[in-house]
Amino acid sequence: MNKMRAGISAENAELPAGSGKERNMRKIDETAYIAEGAKIIKDVVLEKNSSVWFNAVLRGDEEQIIIGEGSNVQDNCVIHVGPECPTVLGKGVTVGHLTLLHGCRIGDNTLVGMNSTIMNGAVIGKNCVIGAGSLITKGTVIPDNSLAFGRPAKIVRNVTDKEIESNRYDADFYIKEAAEYREADR
């Protein structure tokens, strides 16, 4: 087995020291992929065909984190929660490298560009594109089918059918990629 491609399955995902079993309510679907170095801490749900990539950290300390079916959290992302602010990703969501999500909700088939930040109480609709490097401030609502970017992010226009299809392609690509990594680990 190639150590650089070694992933962590639901069976061997380690509980970090000091995380406390009283909040360890992890539910990891057998088809979910967790790459080596990723940390899944406390109250986190990984649904069917979801994936969490290298060195990402998901900390469901005070509330739950849900990674929806077919969604992917790419390398070096941080997902956290706040009091009464769970983080919920719908189906087919792509979270780009180095992104920080904190107590927010993201709708189905949405792309969050690399190095973006989404804060407590923010709600991103379905079929959205959040441009790389964007900041979605506390409590901001981005409606379905929107393209938004900037610091702070502003809605620029509606997404095109081609962009919606691209979001689906990205999510499907990571489902296939995770399957290849999982197979390489056998």
Spans of model-derived segments:
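Short, low-complexity, charge-dense intrinsically disordered segments
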Residues: 7-17
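Exposed boundary/loop context
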Residues: 11-13, 53, 143
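N-terminal segments that cap or nucleate solenoid repeat domains
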Residues: 22-52
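Methionine residue identity
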Residues: 1-4
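Generic preference for hydrophobic/aromatic residues in regular secondary structure cores
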Residues: 6, 25, 56-58
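Glycine-rich hexapeptide-repeat left-handed beta-helix
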Residues: 18-28, 61-69, 75-77, 81-82, ...
